[in-house]
Amino acid sequence: MLLPIAPEPFTAPTDRDMLPSERREFVRTHRTCVFGYRRRADGPAMSVVYYVPTDDDELLVSTMAGRGKAIAVARDPKVSLCVLDERWPFTYLQVYADAVVDDAPGLVVDVMLAVGGRMSGEPLGDDARPFVAAMAEQEQRVVIRCRPYSTFAQPPRHLHDNDQAEQLTHWVSGSVPWDAPDP
């Protein structure tokens, strides 16, 4: 089941690394990410997208079947999602996932409706479903289903002004399995 829009995004701690449960909550309560995938040549490709979390820990991304994201995932299922906090101080969380392309029409429309709600900040009504279904068919939309297996956190470390430089702290984060328990 698709999770509803979170009333309030999780705020990452600024004095320590995020716990595994906090990393999962960060992902579940935010809405945008940089979707990364391998290209045949050159460096990795990245796209800023809205994503929709599910109650069984998948992250769903809507795209067109002919776009690079879908083509690349069909070739190589390893992807990354750099989940972005849209508030100050900016935080991000890298999520590593295995992905598959799903073209089930009902899921495609559900995800497109959910993305529309995340973009506007309010869920779209059922009256939008026929329009979205027609658009999904015309654009040959698919869903990329991402199953996270690991995360890497980057703590927020920003200055509001230069006299805060002495208070700025740094620490080393690390990769943590997606389903890791809290210590």
Task: Indicate where each model-derived feature is located.
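Short acidic (Asp/Glu) patches
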Residues: M64-R67, D76-S80, G121-V132
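Short beta-strand segments
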Residues: H30-A65, V73, V79-L84, Y92-V95
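Mobile-element integrase/transposase regions
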Residues: R16-R28
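Amphipathic alpha-helical interface surfaces
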Residues: R23, K69-A72, V108-V111
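Alpha-helix boundary recognition
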Residues: V27-R28, A74-R75, A136-E137
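Short, surface-exposed beta-strand-loop junctions and turns on beta-sheet-rich folds
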Residues: R67-K69, W88, H160-D161
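Charged, gly/pro-rich active-site loop segments
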Residues: M1-M18, T91-P183
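A generic local structural motif
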Residues: L19-E22, M46-V48, G66-G68, P130-V132
